[in-house]
């Protein structure tokens, strides 16, 4: 049997040990012969630390998986079967700017929502599309599995602006939501099924089942009563307004707090901002501690401290997806794919996050039809933001970027949109070559 070749771009990421653990665990059904970890020269030291740990993990497990490290992406991609992307263009320093600049204007500063999400997309999409061009030449049959944030917007750009059709976006949020529901009901997560539909970081659980019996109202009652947190590591856990959750009647995701509890979330962020600690700084500290652990030549497993990063279950989700495509499992997973009519009211060529049957030919979305009226509008508004943002990222069109910023529901005015856009274009200009010389004439820096 010819083994499988997986290439992970952004291989020096602190998440990589989880990916390696997931591949080791599945070796019987998913025989990975080569795992190539690719990074850029600036990330070389981290790549070497993570790579050495990966080799120790593989050796301890006794599986014949070769770990290759390189900063030459094209060398790695030749004849790959699966390519995963987990890149952060501009590293965490760029994330800190994405969070801090909007807060200066009294606007939510967050990695994947609002102005921060827009700029992360503007920096990341051109790089991902470059990777797509390499894939087209060097491994045209490979599956691209992206978990760089904002995952939905990046999948949207790949589907609409690259010739690659074998592309899937992946997020750990649906798994995290399922784990949370299991915790609320005090049962094992594999007994829970949730019908997910929406967009990335804008996904709803339309129905919740325990052993095949509908328990949606029971779960919403538990969430409404404030008995247990329903959020993720990086999002504060405010009490939901009980009657609102009951009226909504479906399960929101943790990121919906930015839209339904904007004031509380902003106040909380501003407190941190004034103390000079945003989420990016917290993560920078966590990363430092993780890499100290990874350096230890005696460490040969994934350290439990990795769970503190918001991305727990990410890599496990990736391994499950690869396993199901490779083995034509036809199980149900929640991924970002081309809509093709699965959700009415969203363009067919747009990315949606939805339950899919995973086959050897990729994910097949399970149609849900119309989303409930009270949430349909927000989802469509975010989709029009994403489509406009993707176009701005590809064309470097200043006015398209301004439009994307202004129509985002977290941005309070056209004037604030322009000020933030100009300041963030300047702050990130080293990572935004497509916008060269296109800033508006009267931008004041």
Question: For the regions a protein language model found, what residue spans apply to each?
Answer:
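N-terminal Rossmann-like dinucleotide-binding module
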Residues: 6-31, 35-38
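Short acidic low-complexity segments
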Residues: 66-79
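Glycine-rich phosphate-binding loop and adjoining beta1-alpha1-beta2 segment
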Residues: 26-62
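Redox-cofactor binding/interface segments in oxidoreductases and associated redox assembly factors
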Residues: 78, 84-85, 146
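A short helix-to-beta-strand connector/capping loop
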Residues: 59-68, 190
């Amino acid at each position: 049997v010819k083994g499988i070749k997986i290439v992970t771009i952004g291989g020096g990421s602190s998440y990589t040990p989880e990916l390696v653990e997931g591949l080791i665990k599945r070796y019987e059904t998913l025989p990975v012969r080569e795992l190539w970890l690719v990074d850029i020269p600036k990330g070389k030291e981290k790549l070497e630390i993570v790579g050495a740990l990966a080799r120790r993990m593989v050796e301890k497990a006794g599986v014949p998986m070769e770990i290759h490290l390189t900063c030459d992406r094209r060398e790695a991609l030749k004849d790959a079967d699966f390519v995963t992307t987990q890149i952060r263009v501009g590293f965490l320093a760029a994330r800190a700017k994405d969070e801090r600049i909007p807060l200066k204007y009294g606007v939510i500063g967050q990695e994947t929502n609002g102005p921060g999400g827009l700029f992360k997309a503007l920096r990341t999409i051109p790089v991902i599309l470059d990777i797509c061009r390499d894939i087209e030449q060097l491994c045209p049959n490979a599956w691209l599995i992206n978990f760089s944030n904002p995952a939905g917007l990046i999948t949207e750009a790949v589907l609409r602006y690259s010739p690659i059709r074998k592309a899937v976006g992946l997020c750990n949020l649906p798994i995290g939501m399922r784990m949370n529901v299991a915790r609320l009901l005090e049962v094992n997560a594999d007994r829970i099924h949730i019908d997910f539909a929406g967009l990335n970081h804008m996904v709803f659980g339309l129905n919740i089942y325990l052993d095949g019996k509908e328990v949606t109202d029971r779960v919403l009652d538990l969430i409404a009563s404030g008995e247990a947190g329903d959020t993720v590591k990086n999002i504060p856990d405010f009490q939901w307004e009980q009657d609102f959750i009951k009226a909504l009647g479906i399960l929101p995701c943790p990121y919906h707090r930015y839209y339904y509890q904007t004031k509380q979330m902003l106040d909380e962020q501003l407190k941190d901002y004034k103390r000079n600690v945003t989420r990016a700084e917290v993560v920078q500290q966590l990363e430092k501690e993780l890499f100290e652990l990874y350096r230890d030549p005696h460490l040969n497993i994934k350290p439990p401290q990795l769970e503190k990063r918001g991305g727990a279950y990410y890599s496990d989700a990736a391994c499950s997806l690869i396993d199901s495509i490779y083995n034509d499992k036809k199980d149900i997973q929640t991924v970002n794919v081309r809509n093709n009519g699965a959700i009415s009211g969203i363009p067919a060529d747009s990315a949606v996050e939805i339950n899919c049957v995973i086959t050897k030919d990729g994910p097949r979305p399970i149609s849900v039809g119309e989303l409930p009226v009270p949430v349909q509008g927000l989802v469509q508004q975010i989709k029009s933001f994403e489509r406009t943002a993707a176009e701005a990222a590809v064309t470097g069109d200043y006015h398209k970027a301004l439009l994307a910023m202004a129509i985002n529901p977290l941005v309070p005015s056209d004037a604030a949109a322009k000020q933030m856009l100009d300041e963030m274009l300047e702050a990130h200009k080293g990572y935004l070559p497509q916008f060269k010389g296109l800033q508006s004439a009267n931008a004041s820096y």
